[in-house]
Every structure is written in structure tokens, then in C-alpha cells.
């Protein structure tokens, strides 16, 4: 029997992190727990290692196995790649065995092309949603797979909003988004000298290669170095049937922790955006709402979500960091993992889990990273000086401590100034994964 490089979510489990990566193993585990996880499959970390051995190529054996699993996914969902009546659209996401939030790349809405988008608009009776999904896909594919910078597409969006006299992407109508998709394809051709690919299978293989390649992008390398993650581990790739948070005002997407990662308080902590897709929440494109506001907007989905949060925390016996999408009021879970937390939160969570009977005292001690304990001795401002200080801005604390430095407005400036011996505070409207090096060099980060 030939080597197995691909697993359906239903074939894996939470103990297969080395092979399926953290995200793939947890998607398999949630699937086995009967949670609402969109169907899909995981291409293993071994396939990534083989990709690098084969000089950045996916060999014929692995490609054939991937296509076999595409057919299985088509059978399971009743949808087909490129079909004009019931098209299969997928997301392609990375998933290393160690959690690396935001460090590698994601592509959504793969499978759309010029013909499918027209059929998709008719099938959903929602042309705005169809063309919004298509323009997002063209932008992500161009950026992640072909390495055409996001800025060119963001400039086209800004020009369109200015032309229409609106401030938000959500205020653009179907015709505006259709026009944007055409402009995006023209930009793609202008930058690369070729047409945007229309064959979903070519799109898929390009996306998988891009995720493998993203294991060695500069921010991933830097994150691995900071966190002692071996470079030869590679990343898995998760191919999952799409669910849509951007169909309208009964859909949305969000991220949440089962407890507050800054303080350890036993209360859901997170945010969501209505009529949005996954990356929007963390990309800082629009300002999200807090997770407790979901109870007012969609009470049934919120109740189901809180029940799932409790089950996941009980199952993993630790605080969870989750991603979810709501499509037309129906909740889907896209990820869970043990959440990153401050040292102070780690102490509180460990003690609370003991009190709640979830873990033993010995397990609680083992949960605390010894290296994190020095952060409990974090610097603080002199209370007397604070009273005299003039407040020029406020924000929500994401970690304990105080910081002092010159204000800078870009991650690049923060890095350059810090390397020249200056103390800096990085100020951004919202942070994004590209800011990681500047955030590391800054004394503090403020989002306003």
C-alpha cells in the first residue's frame, strides 16, 4: 500500500498533531465529537516535507491522492468543482503542529470563476454575496499564491468607495463588486502577464503549494525562531467546504476565548463581525462587536455557541481559542486550540480549573510555563505620576504591565528605531500578522 498523505476529518483525531497539524487534528476531534464542522480533508505535514524535498513541487502521487479526496468531498457534499448548478467552494488553510496564529496563509472561496460566479449568484438569489465572494477570492489568490501585494487591490476598493460616496465595503452593491472583480482580474493580468486561472483544480493546487511555501515566509520564520519551533516540522493543509459569513445580515464570523486571555476571568472573551468573512475580524478592516453582543443579534446561535464552548473546554481541560462562522443563522465551528494567555491569566486559569475539578494540582503546575513567570514581575507606572499624567488615548489592555517609548506608526519604523537603541511604542489602528517583528521590538503596542 502506498503512503497515505491525505485524511478526511472523520479519519483523524486530536492525537494526530504531528501528522495533521494542530488545526487539522482539532477539526478531526470536533468532527468526532459531533460538532457542526464543515466537511473537509487534511493534507499532512509529511506532504509538506516531501514538497521541499522535491524542490518546491507537489509530486504526481500526492497530487493524485489530493484529487481522489476532492472527489470524496464532492460525494459527501453533493457539490462539484466548477459545476454551474451546485458548485463546490472550499477554503485552504495552513495548520502547523505548533500554534502559529496568523503567521501563515489562508485562501477562501476557491472554486469560483467567471462562469461559476454567475450560476452562484442565481442559485443563492444573492448576486451581491456572489460577487463579494469572487472579488475576495481573486484578491486572496493574487496575494497569497501569486504574491501580488494586497495594496494594489485595496487601492481599487478605496477608489470604488470614493466613486460611490460610501465609507464601508458593505455599502457597495452587487454591480460595484462585479466591477471590482473585473478590475481585480485586470490588475492580476497587468502584474503577471496572464489571465486569472479559471480551472478550480489548478486554483486548488496553486493554493496548496502557496500554503506549503508560507511555512518559509519571513514572518513564519521569525515566529518559529522566537518560539523555538523546528524548521523541519512543515505545515499541514486543511481543505474545507466553505460556509459563508458574508451572505447578509443573518451571517457573520468571529473569534473567541472560553476565558479572558489577559486576566483569566471565567467569561467568554472575543469579537465578531456581521456580514463578513474570516480574515475580516482579525485584519482590522472593520471594527468588530464584542462576543456578548451576539446574544442580542442572534440569541439562538449564541446559545449554541456557549454550549459548544463549555463542551470544548471540558473535553480539552483547558481554555480554548475558537473561530466560528454563522451562515444564515446556522453556526459552524472552524477551529479550536488551547489559547495563548498572559502569565497572570495562566495562574488564575490553572487554579480555577483545579477548583472546578477539571484538572489535578499536579496538572495545574505543569500548565504554567516557567519562562512566563518573570512577566508577573512586569513594570508598572508610578501611581503618583499617573495622577499627574494627561491622557491622550485609551484602549483595552491585552497584557499586563506598563511601557514607555517614542510613538511610531509602522512596524518597520519600530524595528529600525529599536535596532538603533530607541525605545518605541507602536501605535496602529489595528494590528495584523505583518506587524509581528515591529510588535516584538516595541516596548508596547497601542491600537486606537
How does the language model describe each region?
Residues 1-389, 416, 422-425, 430-437, ...:
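Nucleotide/phosphate-binding sheet-loop regions of phosphoryl- and nucleotidyl-transfer enzymes
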Residues 444-448:
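Membrane-bilayer interface helices and TM-boundary transition segments
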Residues 401-415, 422, 429:
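Long, structured protein-protein interaction/assembly regions in large complexes
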Residues 218, 235, 391, 399-405, ...:
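Long, terminal "pre-/pro-" and other extracytoplasmic accessory regions
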Amino acid at each position: 500500500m502506498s503512503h497515505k498523505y491525505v485524511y478526511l476529518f472523520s479519519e483523524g483525531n486530536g492525537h494526530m498533531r504531528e501528522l495533521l497539524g494542530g488545526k487539522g487534528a482539532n477539526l478531526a476531534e470536533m468532527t468526532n465529537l459531533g460538532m457542526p464542522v464543515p466537511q473537509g480533508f487534511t493534507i499532512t505535514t509529511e506532504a509538506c516535507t516531501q514538497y521541499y524535498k522535491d524542490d518546491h513541487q507537489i509530486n504526481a502521487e500526492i497530487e493524485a491522492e489530493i484529487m481522489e479526496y476532492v472527489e470524496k468531498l464532492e460525494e459527501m457534499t453533493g457539490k462539484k468543482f466548477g459545476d454551474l448548478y451546485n458548485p463546490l467552494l472550499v477554503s485552504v488553510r495552513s495548520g502547523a503542529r505548533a500554534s502559529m496564529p496568523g503567521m501563515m496563509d489562508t485562501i477562501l472561496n476557491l472554486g469560483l470563476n467567471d462562469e461559476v460566479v454567475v450560476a452562484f449568484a442565481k442559485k443563492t438569489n444573492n448576486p451581491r454575496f456572489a460577487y463579494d465572494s469572487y472579488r475576495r477570492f481573486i484578491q486572496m489568490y493574487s496575494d497569497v499564491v501569486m504574491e501580488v501585494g494586497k495594496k494594489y487591490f485595496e487601492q481599487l476598493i478605496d477608489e470604488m468607495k470614493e466613486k460611490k460616496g460610501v465609507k464601508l465595503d458593505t455599502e457597495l452593491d452587487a454591480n460595484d463588486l462585479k466591477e471590482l472583480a473585473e478590475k481585480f482580474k485586470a490588475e492580476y493580468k497587468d502584474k503577471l502577464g496572464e489571465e486569472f486561472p479559471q480551472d478550480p483544480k489548478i486554483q486548488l493546487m496553486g493554493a496548496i503549494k502557496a500554503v506549503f511555501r508560507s511555512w518559509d515566509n519571513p514572518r513564519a520564520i521569525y515566529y518559529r525562531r522566537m518560539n523555538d519551533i523546528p524548521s523541519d516540522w512543515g505545515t499541514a493543509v486543511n481543505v474545507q467546504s466553505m460556509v459563508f459569513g458574508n451572505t447578509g445580515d443573518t451571517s457573520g464570523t468571529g473569534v473567541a476565548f472560553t476565558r479572558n486571555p489577559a486576566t483569566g476571568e471565567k467569561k467568554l472573551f472575543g469579537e465578531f463581525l456581521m456580514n463578513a468573512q474570516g480574515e475580516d475580524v482579525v485584519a482590522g478592516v472593520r471594527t468588530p462587536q464584542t462576543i456578548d453582543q451576539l446574544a442580542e443579534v442572534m440569541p439562538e446561535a449564541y446559545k449554541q455557541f456557549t454550549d459548544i464552548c463549555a463542551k470544548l473546554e471540558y473535553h480539552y481541560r483547558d481554555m480554548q481559542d475558537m473561530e466560528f462562522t454563522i451562515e444564515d443563522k446556522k453556526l459552524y465551528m472552524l477551529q479550536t486550540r488551547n489559547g495563548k494567555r498572559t502569565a497572570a491569566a495562566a495562574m488564575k486559569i490553572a487554579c480555577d480549573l483545579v477548583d472546578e475539578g477539571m484538572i489535578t494540582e499536579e496538572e495545574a503546575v505543569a500548565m504554567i510555563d516557567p519562562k512566563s513567570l518573570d512577566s508577573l514581575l512586569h513594570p508598572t507606572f508610578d501611581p503618583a505620576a499617573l495622577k499627574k499624567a494627561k491622557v491622550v488615548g485609551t484602549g483595552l489592555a491585552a497584557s499586563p504591565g506598563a511601557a514607555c517609548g517614542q510613538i511610531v506608526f509602522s512596524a518597520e519604523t519600530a524595528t529600525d528605531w529599536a535596532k538603533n537603541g530607541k525605545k518605541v511604542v507602536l501605535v496602529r489602528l489595528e494590528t495584523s500578522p505583518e506587524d509581528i517583528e515591529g510588535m516584538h521590538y516595541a516596548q508596547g503596542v497601542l491600537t486606537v
